[in-house]
Structures are given as C-alpha cells and as structure tokens.
Amino acid sequence: MLRVVEQPGHQALLRVPAATRAIVSWNAGAPNGGIALAVHRSDGSVAEPLLYARWSPHDRRSLDGSDEKTRVAVDVVRSDVPFSGIGVTSTVALDAVSVAIPPPDDARVAFRARVAPLEVPPLSQTVRGFPESARSWCSPTALAMLLRFHGVDASIPDVAHGVFDSSYAGTGNWAFNAAYAGARGLRGVAAYLRGLDHVAAFVDAGLPVAISISWRGKELPGAPLPHSEGHLVVVRGFEPHHALVNDPAHPAVATRYDRAALDRVFRAHGGVAYLVAPRERTAELVALANNALPVSP
C-alpha cells in the first residue's frame, strides 16, 4: 500500500490501513532540510514526533529516533502497536512525501509483462578509482540505471555521494535513494511490492523497477555472489520462466534469473522496491503500486 501527497508544504498526514511497519520517503529540491515523523496510532493516540533524517549538500544522515512503542531504524518505522497514519513535518517545503506499508498477505496481482524488454542502460557497480564501489554501491548503481533510463545524466559516484547516509556509512538508505531521484527532477518513492508479478505491472507500463533482494547458497542460481544480506537489481523485462535484470554486481550486468527463484528472494527480503517515474506520472505510479487484489476464495 502506497500513499503519496504532492506539494504538501511543510507538513502532511498520510493515512494508511492499520500497520506496524512503514517506509517514509520524500522529494524536495532544497539543499538543506530535516524530517520528523509522528505516528498516529490506531487507538487514536498520537506519538511524540521522532527525528527521521537531516540532509545538507555535504552530509545526509538518518536519525534513529524512538519512544516506548515506536522506533526508526535507518529507513523503516516500526511500531509495537498498530498505527493508521504518519504525520510528516519538514523544515523545508516538500515536492512530495510518501508512506509505504507492506501489502496484506492475501494480496496478489495477475502476471502480465507482455511488452518487449525495456532498454535500461547496463551499469556496473565496480567503478575505477573507488575501491569501495565493488562491495557496496549496488543501490546507487541501480538508481543511476533508472535515472539514465528516464533521461537524467547521472554518474555512479555522484549518485553514491548524493545518497550516502553518514549515520551508518552506507549508500543503501531506501528513503535517501528516493529523495535523490526527486532532487533530479523525477518522482522517486520507496515502496513495498507483492512480488515479481507486481513488478511486471510496472514493466508493462514502461517503468523498470529496482528491487531489494537477499540470498544464501543456491537460493538464486547464477548470482554473482555466494550470498548477500541486501542487494539491488533492476528488473527490465520477463520471459516465460525468467526475469531479465541488470545486476550491477554481475560481470555482464545484463543477465536473467529464474523467475520463481528471484521472486522468492525478493519477497523474503521484504519486497522493497525503488519506483522512479516522470513527475507527471505520479498518479499512475501510485495506482500501479496499489493494484494488489485480495485472493479469491
């Protein structure tokens, strides 16, 4: 489930079905800013605002605020009791703010992906002159591929610098990656999807998707690494039994994985995805994100 409010100014309240976990992401053009969140619990109480993030041209950091029932862990809000909304307050006017919660367990979408594979520029996360890139730049590289697909000239080092979270010294903060896409003139959100069938709906609409996966041993045949606790790849198309992906850690980048295996390691890792589109397609992006349907009895 995804909620997006465009041009909310400095504050917004985003209502969602009862949940205990969410990702809040935002788009803003301002070079400096800060975000605080207030969880609106399902019992009608409202938690005290928690600091979520601060950013400036030279430093971006997540802020792990917490109270007795709610905590922020880098880019995920977790609550011990259900909430039905999140209030967002920003020191700068926002272009957009979004709240994503996991879809219900009985949600599904019909597999489609009838279109030809999308022409997503293949980029490797191993960048000469940046020794840290090979082991840790999958997220900014995947985002750079999405940006270039949409006509934004983005270098991998620039993206890595723009999404770096100094609190945990990494480039994989989901909200920061969405914010960077927004700062480059696109609409970027971090969302929960139901699985590869859900991803296929975006591919059908001409929108590649970056998905977060993890695996061990033989869970993902053909993977470039024996295991990963978190890795980003871009899904650009489908064959009957395979997903066509750009894997920034793969020697060839453009490769394919068994669709069922990739679906399992995607859903097991939470089903988080980067959704990037032109701003004028925001409503369509939200509609696609929310098209999971209850399974018929």
Pin down the residues of each PLM region.
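Aromatic sugar-binding surface patches on proteins
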Residues: D59-V74
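Conserved active-site-adjacent core of cysteine acyl-enzyme catalytic domains
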Residues: V4, D153-S296
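Noncatalytic regulatory segments and standalone regulatory/sensor domains
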Residues: P17, A36, H40-S56, R60, ...
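Short coil-to-beta strand junction motifs in C2/discoidin
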Residues: A30-A36, E229
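Short beta-strands within extracellular/lumenal beta-sheet-rich domains
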Residues: V5-P17
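A short beta-strand element within beta-rich, extracytoplasmic domains
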Residues: P17-A30, I86-V88
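Active-site-adjacent structural segments surrounding the nucleophilic cysteine of cysteine proteases
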Residues: K69-R71, D80-T171, A223
